[in-house]
Regions:
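Glycine-centered, phosphate/nucleic-acid-interacting loop/turn motifs that mediate DNA/RNA or nucleotide
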Residues: 61
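N-terminal helix-turn-helix DNA-binding core of bacterial DNA-binding proteins
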Residues: 5-49
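Basic amphipathic alpha-helical segments that dock to polyanions
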Residues: 50-57
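Short beta-strand "wing" residues that participate in macromolecule-binding interfaces
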Residues: 65
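Basic, amphipathic "hinge/linker" alpha-helix immediately C-terminal to the N-terminal HTH DNA-binding motif
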Residues: 71-93
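Amphipathic alpha-helical dimerization/coiled-coil segments
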Residues: 86-111
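Intrinsically disordered, low-complexity and often Lys/Arg-enriched segments
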Residues: 1-2, 111
Length: 111
């Protein structure tokens, strides 16, 4: 049986990107691969969603980017988390935890 690949909830992609980039400088393809690996193949980020999100996060000042060479020898844009991005990640993680706890409370409710 194949694995169902879930669509990301609206608004969670930015948080996931910030979290992955917090681990160290990484290029766009590396971000999508890391999300897929860490989620045990459940989450898959399409390029059509990833790159607009990266540009948006960079424009907001949450990510900084520099050009470098990828493992394959190709020129790639590497992203790192800015101080502003680190603060935003903390805020988003806090909000996510609060939301997750609220959903869990509802799911545990006995009918």
């Amino acid at each position: 049986m194949g694995v169902d690949r879930s669509e990301l909830l609206q608004g969670t992609l930015d948080m996931l990107i910030l979290k992955i980039v917090a681990l160290g400088p990484v290029h766009g393809y590396g971000i999508s691969q890391r999300i897929q690996q860490v989620s045990r193949e459940v989450l898959q980020v399409q390029q059509g969603s990833l790159y607009p999100a990266l540009h948006r996060l960079e424009k907001r000042g949450w990510l900084a980017a520099t050009w470098g060479q990828s493992d394959s020898g190709r020129e790639a844009k590497f992203y790192r988390l800015s101080a502003k991005g680190r603060r935003q990640l903390q805020l988003e993680e806090s909000q996510w935890n609060r939301l997750s706890e609220a959903v869990a409370l509802i799911l545990r409710t006995v009918s």
